[in-house]
């Protein structure tokens, strides 16, 4: 049995298809984060981009997400050093820090339902940016991700 690509290749060596398959579809990267200007500490909120579908945990306009969502960032292999803002459970961040994929990851389980069952997605746990006045009121204390 061959070694899975995420264990045998660096992030830079992955094909576009392999790179895209690392995304577990949890939707956490679509939540707004706040950064302390003095310490650069990242604070996660439960405030979602208006383009995020909170039931499917995916973008409502995925093909056009980088032009539709003004704050949508494309994760690319040349930005690996910047992945510190991603959730600790994110495959891109974990592999960039030489950590294994979590046991519920779809590449390991073969389905996304294990991720949802483990409580690792944003499914039905968010508010939308259009409904929020003060994002600091929505900081998640001790996020599980």
Swiss-Prot record:
Pfam families: CxxCxxCC. It comes from the Bacteria. Belongs to the UPF0260 family. This is UPF0260 protein VV1_2014. It comes from Vibrio vulnificus (strain CMCP6). The lineage of its organism: Bacteria, Pseudomonadati, Pseudomonadota, Gammaproteobacteria, Vibrionales.
